[in-house]
Amino acid sequence: MKKFLTVLILLLLTAAVIGYFIYPTISDQLGRRRDAEIMAVYREKTAARDAGGKTELFEQAKAWNDSLEQVRTDDVFTAGMIRTSRDYQNRMNVHDGVIGELVIPAIRLSLPIWHLSTETPATRKLVHVNTSSLPADGTGESIILAGPGILQAEGIPGEMGLTDDRMLEDLDSMIPGTLIILNVTDRTMVYRVTGIQMLSAAGLKEMDLTPGEGEERLTIISPRKDRRLMVQAERIPVREARTLLAEEDQATFPENWKNVLFLGCPVMIAGLLVLLIIELIRGRVYRMPGEQSTEDMETQEETGKKTEQNPDRIEEVEEQ
């Protein structure tokens, strides 16, 4: 019974260790699937709108942008519960608060863009900051998006230090020239990174992001401990972006190896541990009372052979 409990404890410990290591990767993949499902519904609802309905969305967004005198942003990650107006939340609202989609091919990122609200804060979602321009596909826009780097798990997994989605974690690896794509309804807006910097929360608040005449800017902000990573980009023509994306596709090596390592290594270690446990179990076979082991049977066979080969020796022993 003790041997059985030992094996059971080893199996449970192995499962716990494997789960600890692969939980973030599995959770991230499930999060990506949820985001893909959200965007699939978004595209369906976009396709269901006629041309007039789509144009009206952009006109509403442009009216919002015209009402902005200056583009600044508070630190939306520490500002507590942020309430936004119903008027803001109704603009560009195609599906359940989703404005569009952020795509960064260089880091394999694709995320829905939500309206900033109490239900969708910047600490949990990639959001549009309501003090900036909405993506109206026009000139003089300065769009600000904000979201977490790594989404902390909720409940007990979060208390254990486990994470859920890897959202804007890889923004650090971007360089000037990296392309960023915004898909809003049936329109595509492409931006090229011009600068990446790390700021304090106070420094971020002091930044004046108001666009100049004819400028079209995109800013993405993500927290890094007590600092704020800020990526700034300028809009470029879609035709130019297609050429650059084609060049990136030819030069980019697949980055799925990260997931292979995160999933493959724990599985391989688990397999080795299971094989070790099986060998231990095979070496300690449980037998019923009176049941002979294989080793005992082999010993008896060897003794019988020796008896047949030396019968005189046995008789001498018996006479003594």
Residue spans of the language-model regions?
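Solvent-exposed, non-transmembrane regions of membrane-associated and secreted proteins
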Residues: K3-L263, E279-E291
